[in-house]
Structures are given as C-alpha cells and as structure tokens.
Design a protein with these regions (language model features):
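Conserved catalytic alpha/beta core of Sir2/sirtuin-type deacylases, generalized to analogous enzyme cores
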Residues: 1-178
Length: 178
C-alpha cells in the first residue's frame, strides 16, 4: 500500500494553489504548518516550518529505534534493514492506534502562536481535532478554512467554507489588509 502511494507521490503530484499561498504568506508572517498529510507537498511548494504529525511517505524508520529515520523513494520490503542496527525498516507513517509524532513540539508551538488556522479537515481525527479547543482555552483566535463546516466548527471564531484553494486566498486577502 505505502509503496504504491510513494510511487504516486513521486510521479509528479504537484502542490495546489493553497500550498503556494501559504508560502506567499510566510514571506510576511511567521507561519508554522502542522499537517496530518503524509505527502511532502508543503515542502515541494517551498514552505519552511512544517511538522508532519502523521509522518511522511518519503521516509522510513527503524522498528527498534524510532530516531533512525531515512529519506526513502523506492519500494520498501522486509529485505531493507536499518544501517545502524540491522533491524527491519518500516514506513515513517503513523499507523492507526499509534501516537502522532512530535506532539511536544506541536504543544510548544501552540503556546507561542497568536492565531490557529485549520485548513481542509473534517475535525474528526484526534488529537489534531482537539487543537482548536486548546486555542480556545488560551483565548487565542481560531479560523476554519474548509470545504464545509467541520465536526467541531462551533469552536471556531471565524470560518470560510469553500474549497481550500479559494478559502486560503480569501483568508490571505483578509489578513494582509488588516
């Protein structure tokens, strides 16, 4: 499954306009992207501060030492071993039931930032779906940019419900003029 997804990603899938607008915003504002997506479209578009809380398709890691993470663009099978310890390698992707990656770093960023913007999510996947509650508790403004209202839409202070490419551009225009 992950080999097929990796091949699809590396066959020329491109970032969309929303990815590119985030890069544009990054020139004027401090932006930290926390993504549940396992593609690298934010990196391809040029964003610089990205946390992949569910991992990345183009990386693998050792099953014995999670700090042994490697770039990987080929098919992965049981013959591929960790060059440090010889253990089996696996996709660097958060499997169902596993704790997402870098949660401490995400929490630290939440404490420092002044605005939370959620883009293109159903609001049903935890712990990410709970981020808006964390920001509400800290009395920080929250924005939802989504095709339709998310499951936790009532917790957002402001929303634009349109395709991400349209919603992100409208948000950019609002934020840069205020």
């Amino acid at each position: 499954f992950y080999n097929k997804r990796r091949q699809e990603l590396n066959s020329g899938i491109k970032p969309n306009k929303a990815h590119n607008i985030l890069v544009e915003l990054e020139k004027s504002l401090e932006i930290n992207i926390i993504t549940q997506n396992i593609d690298n479209l934010h990196e391809i578009s040029g964003s610089s501060s990205i946390i992949h809380m569910h991992g990345e398709l183009n990386k693998v890691r050792c099953i014995m030492d999670e700090s042994h993470i490697f770039e990987w663009y080929e098919n992965l099978d049981e013959t591929h071993k960790c060059p440090h310890c010889g253990a089996q390698m696996r996709p660097h992707v958060c499997f169902y039931g596993e704790m997402p990656y870098q949660m401490d770093e995400i929490h630290n960023l939440a404490m420092e930032c002044s605005l939370f913007v959620s883009i293109g999510t159903s609001g049903g996947t935890y712990p990410a779906a709970g981020f808006v509650s964390l920001f509400k508790e800290m009395k920080k403004p929250t924005v939802e940019l989504n095709l339709e209202p998310s499951l936790n839409q009532s917790q957002f202070d402001f929303a634009i419900h349109k395709p991400a490419t349209v919603a992100v551009e409208e948000f950019k225009n609002l934020i840069l003029t205020n």
